[in-house]
Amino acid sequence: MRSSSKIKIDPSQHELVPKHEVLSIEEAYKILKELGIKPEQLPWIRASDPIAKLVGAKPGDIIKITRKSSLSGEVVVYRYVISG
């Protein structure tokens, strides 16, 4: 086994991983205003999460996750990026 070679896998290419995207400041403000909440009230995702790293999310960002659903077509959820 070679210690110098590492296998890199892109989890976003897996069919079960939904689309993740970092919202702009304007988009984040609009969503928070619509929901009537503060960013910290959203479910959290750590900046060290493989998908958060892949999309370049930093603590304080909000990630939009778009999932396909057999019952409701498409579901959009949001995550607040925390350190760690």
UniProtKB/Swiss-Prot annotation:
Protein localization: Cytoplasm
CC per GO annotation: cytoplasm; DNA-directed RNA polymerase complex
EC number(s) per entry: 2.7.7.6
Catalyzed chemical reaction(s): RNA(n) + a ribonucleoside 5'-triphosphate = RNA(n+1) + diphosphate
Keywords associated with the record: Cytoplasm, DNA-directed RNA polymerase, Nucleotidyltransferase, Transcription, Transferase
InterPro entries reported for this sequence: Arch_Rpo5/euc_Rpb5 (IPR014381), RNA_pol_subH/Rpb5_C (IPR000783), RNA_pol_subH/Rpb5_CS (IPR020608), RPB5-like_sf (IPR035913)
GO biological process, one term: transcription elongation by RNA polymerase I
Domain of life per record: Archaea
Protein family membership: Belongs to the archaeal Rpo5/eukaryotic RPB5 RNA polymerase subunit family.
Function (record text): DNA-dependent RNA polymerase (RNAP) catalyzes the transcription of DNA into RNA using the four ribonucleoside triphosphates as substrates.
HAMAP family on file: RNApol_Rpo5_RPB5
Protein name, per record: DNA-directed RNA polymerase subunit Rpo5
